[in-house]
Structures are given as structure tokens and as C-alpha cells.
Amino acid sequence: MKKVLFLAALLLVCFSGVTNAQTRKQREDAKREAWKKERQEKKALEAQQDSVSYVQAINALKNGSFVLEADNVVFRNGIMRFVSSNTNYVEVNDGQGIIQTAFTNFVYNWSPNGLGGVTVQGNVNGISMRQDKDGNVYYNYGINGIAVSATVSIVLTGGTNQASVTINPNFSGNTLTMNGY
């Protein structure tokens, strides 16, 4: 009789362990599926927001009224530096343009604008805009300021509002690329 009770108790313990392992696995699988679903929903929402931002960016380029704030700057020798978007930007509004650079976290201590960079303000001319099959938008224009004139090329990445601006001064080879939104 003791053997039968012992075997019954042993079977009961083994059975409860198997059941517990199965329910734990089911809980883990349910958590994993919920996480995957949440991640897919988040990606879908981000894609929708990016497409709305992309359309707004294209409309701003078409209207000739936009500001591109740079997060980083790439110099002609390939050195990249993160910069403040408050003081590094390209702006166009109703035929007037401003290009401002300020490298406060880099080597330049003195500059014409007092911020460690250059500010060009002037008239915008020669605007051209085209879009390729991938949705990338190419926007080019010239800017003529008091002391400096430059050619500006903007590439708006398809499906997002992320852009790259290449500034090519007409009287020097100091090309500068700014990346931002």
C-alpha cells in the first residue's frame, strides 16, 4: 500500500512539473507573439509618419520655403562632426536664402560669423528640381551673397524627410556636406 501511495505521489509530482513547463512555454510564446505584433504596429506607424513627412518636405521644396537643419557635417576630407541643428542650417524663403554653419565643437575658434563657421545670405537663383524612380528628390540652386556665392545641392531621400545638402562654393574647393531633416 505504501508503494502504491508513493508511486501515485511521484506520478502526481511528475505530471504537475510537465504541466507547469507547458504553461510556462505557452506564456513565453504568448509574450513573444505580443512583442512581435507590437513591433510590427510600431514599424507601420513610423512608416506612415515618414511618408507624411516626405510629402510635406516635397511640398516645401516646391513652394520654395523650407529650412533644413543639419545634425552632422562632413568636410571635404571626409571628417564628420555632429553639430547643433540650431546653428547649422540651410534656409530658402521667397527667393532669399541663408546658409549658416557653426562648428563650436571643432577646431575653428575664429570665423566671420563669430560662431566658428560662415553665414551666407543672399538671393537664390537657378532652382531645379527632379525626382527619380526611387522617390529621391534632387533640388539644386545657386545663392549669391555679399562675399560668397555657392551652388547648393539637396537630396531628399525617398519616403522620409531626411536630406543631404552639398554646398560647393564657387570660388574655392571647400565643399561641405550637411545631413539632417
Where are each of the predicted segments found?
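Bacterial Sec-dependent N-terminal signal peptides
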Residues: 1-27
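Sec-dependent signal peptide cleavage junction
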Residues: 18-60
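Helix-rich interaction surfaces within compact, conserved domain-sized segments
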Residues: 29, 125-181
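N-terminal post-signal-peptidase region of extra-cytosolic proteins
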Residues: 52-53, 70-85
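Well-ordered beta-strand positions
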Residues: 60, 91, 98, 155-157
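A short, Trp-centered hydrophobic/proline-enriched beta-strand micro-motif
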Residues: 61-73
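Short beta-strands and strand-coil junctions in structured, solvent-facing domains, enriched
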Residues: 75-76, 106, 148-151
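Mid-length scaffold segments of soluble, non-membrane domains
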Residues: 80-134
